[in-house]
Amino acid sequence: SGAGPSPDRFVALGSEGALGIITEGWARLQGRPTYKATAGYRFTDFFDAARAVRAVSQAGLYPANVRIVDGTELQVNGAGDGSFTLMVVSFESADHPVDAWMERAEECCLDHGGTVDVPWRDNPDAHLQGAVGAWRTAFIRMPYNREQLTPRGIISDTFETAITWDRFEEFY
């Protein structure tokens, strides 16, 4: 899951236990990251942000996290005024500095019309600042808010899917 491991998702929500019993498993562990960088970029056009994500993806950078959040979601969650789309990009490594990867990702964002929301260089708290930090706080709070909203018939969530780039704009 994009939200990380959680025993309740493995047992309660999956077929495990209902269709059989797990008798064996394995896990691959990585060292805890010592090098981290997060930045945020604002875009006036959602599809420009999507093009920046595509550029980062096709540059072979493999960020630990890259998300675009549209203006409506930012506004609903108190992370923006609805006038911009936010792209959050993060890199992590237990082995080596990530500056070169973050620099290239920033070039991709700026090349596609993004402007810096939160600078990353020499800023270990970038993930807590600006629209990036406000959205992060809302994202972490969302499961608790969902408990209050769902009984009232309000459902607001992120749905992940996969589609080819040439069909993305029409799909969105």
Please annotate each region the language model reported.
Residues 1-32:
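FAD-binding core of FAD-dependent oxidoreductases
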Residues 27, 31, 37, 42-45, ...:
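C-terminal substrate-recognition/cap domain of FAD-linked oxidoreductases
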